[in-house]
Amino acid sequence: MSRVFKKTCSNGKLSIYLGKRDFVDHVDMVEPIDGVVLVDPEYLKGRKMFVMLTCAFRYGHDDLDVIGLTFRKDLYVQVQQVVPAESSSPRGSLTVLQERLLHKLGDNAYPFTLQMVVNLPCSVTLQPGPDDTGKACGVDFEVKSFCAENLEEKVSKRDSVRLVIRKIQFAPLEPGPGPWARLCRRFLLSAQPLLLQAWMDKEVNYHGQPISVNVSINNSTNKVIKKIKISVDQITDVVLYSLDKYTKTVFVQEFTETIAANSTFSKSFAVTPLLADNCHKQGLALDGKLKQGDTNLASSTILRPGVDKELLGILVSYKVRVNLMVSCEGILGDLTASEVGVELPLILMHPKPSNEAASSEDIVIEEFAQQEPSGESQEALAAEGNEGS
């Protein structure tokens, strides 16, 4: 059974069909966007029909536009003329889903295929505050279709149909070794140093799964370690127009472990940063949203050699911090306590899902609410039910 996403413009004359809304970046290529557009022939009336792919960086909200504060930059725009098809446009073979849709929808349906370039960012959304309205800040992708005499003609929202998609990356199948860090710290009146080592078993960790952080301590000093604090920070770099950097702690936990002077310690700790524990932190980077509640903490940005960082708009990275609370022995020891620690880079991503091809010729269409002329409506999915091919 094949799942198809459908959206119709508010005048009901133009509909767009896509087989999926998540398109995978495989580093050397990105999955093509193949779909079908259905148009009322009376509405077309000899005009041209276009399909447009836009990757945009938004830093600001629609309601600020009246005072000129909204910041939006189109990072990439690709336009394909679908009707009449241009002879210069590459014409590849139709996908199985396109063939089924064309057979089902009839002569007024037209296929299209868009191919992203490889140096575009993945979809990222900055978590809005409780009073924020309009589109969230971040990087988003949109497929739009409209009819016009030419590309210079101004087309109203009522006469166009737009569907948000996502560009995503999955973790590499063969990740490298886990990160490792070491700290040697000497203290006054202690002949020997404190040695702290921390490492992770894997280079890449998955969203929602515990991260194993291994800690080894050789305390050859006269100090006492009262507790171990492990935290995970998300670092978001807005690189398109400025050097803004935001650091948000997405996990922190203190472990009461007493490590006496002239002793050793070794233990593995499990930490799990989750969006559910950070849902009220404004400015937190999330994987791009398609509908309410369908996302998670943003995946780490994987940079390709030679890519212009400004084209990526927003860069996301993570680090794990392991801190020791070190104090002197005795009642007044806590008054002179100090922290020492190390940092580990963390790559947080989704595992690559198994490819399960649809074997049935049935099509299930999930239709979105028609978009309102005044702007984007809430994209609530309503299953249209099982549609035969």
UniProtKB/Swiss-Prot annotation:
GO terms for molecular function: G protein-coupled receptor binding. It is found in: Photoreceptor inner segment; Cell projection, Cilium, Photoreceptor outer segment. Expressed in cone photoreceptors in the retina (at protein level). It comes from the Eukaryota. Its main location: other. Residues 369-389 are annotated as: Disordered. Keywords: Cell projection, Disulfide bond, Sensory transduction, Vision. One of its GO terms (biological process) is G protein-coupled receptor internalization. SUPFAM superfamilies: E set domains. Belongs to the arrestin family. Homodimer; disulfide-linked in response to retinal illumination. Interacts with CXCR4; the interaction is dependent on the C-terminal phosphorylation of CXCR4 and modulates the calcium ion mobilization activity of CXCR4. Interacts with GPR84. This is Arrestin-C. The gene is ARR3.
